[in-house]
């Protein structure tokens, strides 16, 4: 099973594709300065072949463009580690927060609505995640998307230590 891990920042994207259950990393990519017309950086590396490349001065105006660049590299003849994006079985996101959801959840419409409801608490990160997840839903609609919410950590804090 191939699992794509995605970390979406306010102006960055990071990806790593794993073969599971072996936990073998197949490739990784990093995009910095998303939103830039001419200063974005795209770095990709195959951990199978060791081939890497880095593009600087790129126009990556939104997460959609960055995600497409990554998926193109993932299946490219020279650098790709899979033949088709259809080989991706799951996509996991390190998400921030969603109203009423903690821990690990499939990113259903209900969970996404909870993320929208908390945009006022995490406007930068939740907005970025909503855009990226929406793009993956458009490009890979049949692939389950899973969110690991950071707020799960706080559920383990003893009551007497909570503020």
Predicted feature residues:
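Extreme N-terminal starter segment of soluble prokaryotic enzymes
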Residues: 1-4
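A short acidic Gly-Thr/Ser loop motif
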Residues: 6-11
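Short beta-strand-loop/turn "lid" adjacent to the catalytic site in phosphate-handling enzymes
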Residues: 74-125, 146, 152-162
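Internal, well-ordered alpha-helical segments in soluble enzyme and binding-protein domains
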Residues: 111, 129-132
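Conserved phosphate-coordination/catalytic loops
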Residues: 61-64, 123-127
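Glycine-rich, N-terminal phosphate-binding loop and its surrounding beta-alpha-beta segment
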Residues: 47-94
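Short glycine-rich, Thr/Ser-proximal phosphate-binding strand/loop in the N-terminal lobe
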Residues: 12-61
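A structural motif corresponding to the C-terminal end of an alpha-helix
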Residues: 132-145
